[in-house]
From Swiss-Prot:
The chain crosses the membrane at residues 20-42, 63-83, 91-111, 116-136, 164-184, 191-211, 239-259, 285-305, 313-332, 337-354, 377-397, 405-425. Signal peptide: none annotated. It comes from Staphylococcus aureus (strain MSSA476). This is Putative proline/betaine transporter. It is found in: Cell membrane. The keyword Transmembrane helix applies. It is a multi-pass membrane protein. Pfam families: MFS_1 (PF07690). The gene is proP. Keywords: Cell membrane, Membrane, Symport, Transmembrane, Transmembrane helix, Transport. The lineage of its organism: Bacteria, Bacillati, Bacillota, Bacilli, Bacillales. The keyword Protease does not apply. GO terms for molecular function: symporter activity. Belongs to the major facilitator superfamily. Metabolite:H+ Symporter (MHS) family (TC 2.A.1.6) family.
């Protein structure tokens, strides 16, 4: 491949930070919706599955509606991924936030089972399906856009900022539910209180749309993809044939990230209430505090990943959860409130290593002309099978085995697999250019360096297979 130093991408670090904010709003929207749903499962179950008398089965049906919706994420990933690779990242990010806001609003407006019968759970499922379809293109698009707009040397630190949106959305959901449960009676929450956060989610979506309309297309897409449209002809079968190892590593990384993520953010509140017997307000405050602490931790690990490589930070997370998952869940059963907090913090601490590294590292696994679609499909298939089903699987394991530590065994097993795959198959790309792209730099010194060292600038050429 002929090297042209004029193709080195000069990016503005300040603009890169603004892209993190604009894309992070979408993450906040997604996780605000998910957090509200997770915290209000008891009320949602009572409204949409009221004929079911058994509370455990009603809860499983409510989680099942969430899990089934995840099956639509890969379809959304295919559709939005193809559009994103062909027409640009920005158009997809604008579309997905509109669809997410609409589906969140719809859930807040739905009549209950007592009002319209079987249509109530059907409409709830359809709203979750729309949410799943739209988020199928959202997170992969946000990761791709931020990675392609950031200086290579700061890709992980800026990418970790994307997860502030994730954590902030969940924190906002947690605070709102805590406030509502404090001021409203349980009867009022079951009647109308649970709907309020879903209705307010519309305003978060509109704010995100306003910010995203101001975004420019990523420099990598403009310089390396849009100018070479003939490279889009490669199909998914060819992608799998050429890059099956990269796809496998990405799949496993998303598995251990999302099983941990959904275990802590979606299942743990229910676990603390139903197994540990903490009240809803205490649970909400605890999870909110841990999420807040995770924000600076994620930013710290993001900077660390840029210095020592994301592979080592991955191994801190997978290794830590291999050793401490069971211990953390055991601490949750302590009679001491402080010890319970420590147990939750252990899980949040190691989760923050994934929050820090995933946004900046997953997009680097694929070449520019196939990045969005391949990442989107791989990410969403993995999330659909393992992420969205985590609360359902964890609930089933406890019910089936009678062992309250069963979720910890599951988390440990996933972490062991992740540790082995990352150790033997993952290549650290921190500080390197994205595959298929010229380097992204934010100063003339780095630009001059790569101009004089083309082999380092295009390190990926020798690995390319199509």
């Amino acid at each position: 491949m002929d090297f042209n130093k004029e193709n080195i991408n000069m990016v503005d670090a300040k603009k890169a930070k603004k892209t993190v904010v604009a894309t992070g709003i979408g993450n906040a929207m997604e996780w605000f919706d998910f957090g509200v749903y997770a915290y209000t499962t008891a009320y949602i179950g009572a409204n949409f599955f009221s004929p079911v008398e058994n509370a455990d089965i009603r809860q499983m049906l409510t989680f099942a509606a969430l899990a089934i919706a995840f099956l639509l994420r890969p379809i959304g990933g295919v559709v939005f991924g193809i559009i994103g690779d062909k027409y640009g990242r920005k158009v997809v990010l604008t579309s997905t936030i509109i669809l997410m806001a609409f589906s969140t609003l719809t859930i807040g407006l739905l009549p209950s089972y007592d009002q319209i019968g079987l249509w109530a759970p059907i409409l709830l499922l359809l709203a979750r399906v729309l949410q799943g379809f739209s988020t199928g293109g959202e997170y992969a698009g946000a990761m791709t856009y931020v990675a392609e707009s950031s200086p290579d040397k700061r890709r992980n630190s800026l990418g970790s900022g994307l997860e502030i949106g994730t954590l902030s959305g969940y924190i906002a959901a947690s605070i709102m539910i805590a406030v509502l449960t404090f001021f409203l009676t349980d009867e009022q929450m079951a009647s109308f209180g649970w709907r309020i956060p879903f209705l307010l989610g519309l305003f978060l979506g509109l704010f995100g749309l306003y910010l995203r309309r101001k975004l420019e297309e990523s420099p990598v897409f403009e310089n390396d993809v849009a100018t070479q449209p003939e490279r889009d002809n490669i199909n998914f079968l060819q992608i799998i044939r050429f890059y099956y190892i990269d796809i496998f590593v990405c799949f496993v990384a998303v598995v251990f990230f999302n099983v941990t993520n959904y275990m802590v953010t979606a299942y743990l509140p229910t676990y603390l209430e139903q197994v540990i017997k903490l009240d809803a307000t205490t649970t909400s405050v605890l999870i909110t505090c841990v999420m807040a602490i995770m924000i600076p931790l994620a930013l710290m690990f993001g900077k660390l990943a840029d210095k020592i490589g994301e592979k080592k930070v991955f191994l801190i997370g997978t290794g830590g959860l291999t050793l401490f998952s069971i211990i953390a869940f055991m601490l949750l059963h302590s009679q001491s409130f402080v010890v319970i907090v420590i147990g939750i913090f252990i899980l949040g601490f190691f989760l923050s290593t994934y929050e820090a590294t995933m946004p900046g590292s997953l997009p680097t696994m694929f070449y520019s002309h196939i990045r969005y679609r391949t990442l989107s499909v791989t990410f969403n298939i993995s999330v659909s099978i393992f992420g969205g089903t985590t609360p359902l699987v964890a609930t089933w394991l406890v019910t089936k085995t009678g062992d309250p530590l069963a979720p910890a065994y599951y988390l440990t097993a996933i972490s062991v697999i992740g540790f082995l795959v990352i150790t033997f198959l993952h290549l650290s790309t921190a500080g390197k250019s994205l595959k298929g792209s010229y380097p992204n730099v934010d100063n003339e010194q780095d630009r001059a360096y790569y101009a004089e060292h083309p082999k380092e600038a295009l390190w990926w050429v020798k690995e390319r297979k199509n």
